[in-house]
UniProtKB/Swiss-Prot annotation:
Residues 435-444 have a biased composition (Gly residues). Residues 1-163, 412-474 are annotated as: Disordered. Residues 425-434 have a biased composition (Low complexity). Its main location: nucleus. This is Uncharacterized RNA-binding protein C660.15.
């Protein structure tokens, strides 16, 4: 065996292992004993035939072992094969079926994959890898997660309420757009609304807006604002349900030179103040002399109420608990429906409507009044000093009449049948403030009584006999 054959054997061992050493020796032995002198035409064919026989034996032992390339030259020299030799190689391999198969070209069931199937499988594997990479980047991408968390914080319902503000003292001409344009200098505004009357469509002088970032609220409240020629009053909006839970106080008699900041700082000594507001006149912008303070808890209210005297700028002020409007409405309803005929709703309704009198009582009273007025028209002039029997006022009518008059002539039921002192019996239907006897005071017969200053004759009302002027006297 020559030097080239030895080098061939060593290289073959490196590629295929020692187990095929015998096969290599047999193949090389056949090559030595061959008497055929290779020519340029059949040189490649013979080499391929030999390699095909050796490959057939190796395939029986291990069908998945890889074969060296077709251009491998056992003699160590590079051989250039013609197109005819390559065609013969393909025919020989197809006839003998001795070429080792590629393991990657078989599926899990051992069936060969076509080129189209293999391409599809590669595409599917690539798509799976792409999806996996995308999922991993979505799960591990810190930048994306942080941005999503920021967006969730900014748009969460809780933070949205924190960014809401009440804007008071608006000009009647201020619109939604002008209000939004002004406050967008402090941050992004999610929504903005000027409240309007549902009937007339006119502005009610206040509105609401919501910032995307709640921190903008503090910046807005730290400055004074002028919009459309008026000083506006922005406040942090407190939800209605939270207003009922918080401890709110009314403060009256606040000096006009007290600013809202001084007002807040003064009440901070009793507890943490959530909101402090001085009410302003919508037209003039001047303080109205009262305001409201909202504490964080009830203990601050108790501490404020425990002070015997509270003075601001040397002027005493009045402090008391603020009652929510809902509680005031409930109290009013209980007052209207809780004191009259709880067992009979119809009776209670009539009592409220007629000032404590049922329809039957009212009908009886008006019949007596008609009889009384008829007698007054038919009464002779000389009988002016004799009082005519008056109708008896039903029970409860006195209270009702006092409520209707509200500061008019005082009515005493015990003097109903005693007349007025002017020679004219008292008439319940006579309007308050009438010119009866020139009377304009509050207490008949009292020190404020004023008499008629007319002509001092028979028609003008003489001063004798204790009688004053009467319009029916002729």
């Amino acid at each position: 065996m020559g030097g080239s054959d030895f080098e061939d054997d060593e290289l073959f061992k490196d590629l295929y292992g020692e187990e095929n050493e015998k096969k290599v020796e047999s193949a090389s032995g056949n090559q030595e004993t061959s008497n055929v002198t290779p020519t340029k035409e059949n040189e490649g064919y013979e080499e391929l035939e030999k390699s095909g026989e050796a490959g057939a034996e190796r395939t029986k032992e291990n069908p998945f072992r890889e074969e060296p390339g077709a251009d491998f030259d056992r003699s160590g020299s590079d051989q250039q094969y013609s197109a005819e030799a390559e065609a013969n190689q393909e025919d020989d391999l197809n006839e003998t079926s001795q070429q080792a198969p590629d393991p990657s070209s078989y599926d899990i069931r051992g069936q060969a994959l076509s080129s189209a199937t293999w391409d599809n499988a590669e595409d599917g594997e690539n798509s799976k890898n792409d999806n996996y990479n995308e999922n991993q980047s979505a799960l591990t991408g810190s930048g994306a997660m942080e941005s999503n968390e920021d967006n969730a914080e900014e748009t969460s319902p809780f933070n949205r309420e924190d960014g809401k503000m009440f804007i008071g003292g608006l000009n009647w001409e201020t619109t939604d757009d002008s209000l939004r344009d002004y406050f967008e200098q402090f941050g992004e505004v999610l929504d903005c609304t000027v409240m309007r009357d549902s009937t007339t469509g006119r502005s009610r002088g206040f509105g609401f807006l919501t910032f995307k970032n709640p921190k903008c609220v503090n910046e807005v409240m730290s400055k004074e604002h002028h919009l459309d020629g008026k000083i506006i009053d922005p406040k942090r909006a407190i939800p209605r349900e939270e207003q009922e839970k918080t401890a709110k106080m009314f403060v009256g008699g606040v000096p006009g030179d007290c600013t809202e900041e001084e007002f807040r700082n003064f009440f901070n000594q009793f507890g943490r103040v959530l909101d402090a507001t001085l009410m302003m006149d919508k037209d003039t912008g001047r303080p109205r002399g009262f305001g409201f303070v909202t504490y964080e808890n009830e203990s601050a209210v108790e501490a404020t109420m425990s002070q015997p005297y509270i003075t601001i700028h040397g002027k005493p002020v009045e402090v008391k608990r603020a009652t929510p409007k809902a509680s005031l409405r409930d109290s009013h309803d209980r007052h209207q429906h809780g004191y009259h005929g709880n067992a009979n709703p119809y009776y209670a309704q009539n009592m409220n409507m007629y000032g404590g009198m049922t329809p039957a009582m009212m009908a009886q009273y008006y019949r007596q009044m008609q009889q009384y007025m008829e007698a007054m028209r038919n009464m002779p002039a000389a009988a002016g000093a004799v009082p005519y029997p008056q109708p008896v006022m039903p029970a409860g009518m006195a209270d009702w009449q006092q409520q209707q008059q509200q500061g008019a002539a005082y009515f005493d039921p015990s003097k109903m049948n005693q007349g007025t002192g002017d020679g004219v019996p008292f008439s319940p239907s006579m309007p308050s403030g009438s010119s009866r006897g020139g009377y304009h005071g509050r207490n008949p017969g009292g020190p404020n009584r004023q008499r008629y200053r007319g002509r001092r004759d028979g028609r003008g009302g003489n001063t004798g006999g204790g009688h004053s002027f009467h319009p029916y006297r002729r």
